Amino acid sequence: MRVCFYTLGCKVNLNETGALEQLFRANGFTIAQEGEAADVFIVNSCTVTNFGDQKSRKWLRRKKRENPGAVTVLTGCYPQAFPEEAAQFMEADLVCGNGDRKAILENVQKLLDGHERIVAIAPHQRGEQFEELPVERFETHTRAFIKVEDGCNRQCAYCVIPRARGPVRSRAEESILAELHQLAAAGYREVVLSAISLPSYGLDTGTNLVELVEKCAQVPGIERIRLGSLDPDMLTPKFISRLAAVDKLCPQFHLSLQSGCTATLRRMRRVYTAQEYAQVVEQIRAAYGSRPVSFTTDCICGFPGETAEDFEESCEFLKKIGFLKVHVFPYSRRSGTPAYDFPDQIHEREKQERSRHMNAVAEQVRRETLAAFEGTEDEVLLETPLSGTLFTGYTRLYIPVVVSAPGCESGQIVRVKLGRYDGERVRAALC
């Protein structure tokens, strides 16, 4: 039997798909790639935008049309957040949410045996436990992603994720550390702690993210630890100083911004101001002292009520911080969120224009930030081999580089001197 997966959305979704692939493989299935024939087609959906829902439905419709005898599965955040709507999508033989993922295999086997269509979407509940879905292999044999938390307790005006993912649920430290030991033994040198709300780790279990990072750093063989997205309001001075003391922690912080304008942040129902965000950045820089540190972020433009002045203020804030990378998103009006009904919606054409302008600002800031690192040294984890001795990789600061490394191999960490940015990567040379 062959099964084909299609994944939309975040790194957590990719991690969960990897776990499902592992589960199906262990039970005799072969993983088919896109475009190949299969007996089962599974879409792990993302519901951050209405467009994501449409992409999931479109993919399954096409697979059902091309493979009328195959079993089709709609799982993930879309059916979890909008169960009644998803249940009416008849091209899916199995519709299930993002809880009890291991039951997907059992239900698929029932359908292969002739069972009628199955809809199995259980709502998230307070007090439910983290679902263990370990992954043993990743696309590249260099960086591993470990899911340590699920759920979000926040209520941002534009976001449907709390509805899709439920309340905060933390994975047990013992389970995380056991997986880390397995990954180290398999040759992985860098791990990324991923989550839906990473700084919320431990809120439900009496521990915290800093303690987890400190324990992860003690695992032999793991040389670099990287953090997923962080909310600035949850980073206290003590939290920051303890993180800065962990040598294995990569000094690259993805601090969720969403807007550099305080008025817009308030409408978004974010719980910090632009000034408070900037203060956290300065606290992190102060904690690292003379050691270099980098910042990446996400920013939304065209949120309801955002004036031209608000937008310019947000762009100026990007320059003020000096981000290494900014992921810019035009606001997507998501049904099921408070912001969907907000007045003063921005016209789509204006949102796209603001997005183009902000991307240009972000790219200029990126060039200036990378220019400041030219001539400095850093360590690079060699990843994809190109032609001959050329490798791509990332520094501890998450600077993408290309370097000639004769005699080296993928997964090796080497020290390099950073050169010029070519618009895609920084040219580097071995020290």
Language model features with spans:
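Charged helix-capping and loop-helix junction motifs
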Residues: 57-59, 173, 206-212, 273, ...
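Hydrophobic, well-ordered secondary-structure elements that form the walls
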Residues: 255, 298, 318, 326, ...
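Proteins enriched for Cys/Gly/acidic motifs involved in redox and nucleic-acid/cofactor modification
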Residues: 1-200, 238, 249, 253, ...
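Catalytic cores of alpha/beta
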Residues: 83-87, 235-242, 303-320
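Terminal RNA-binding accessory module
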Residues: 341-431
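Radical SAM/AdoMet-radical enzyme domain recognition
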Residues: 185, 210-211, 218-224, 235-297
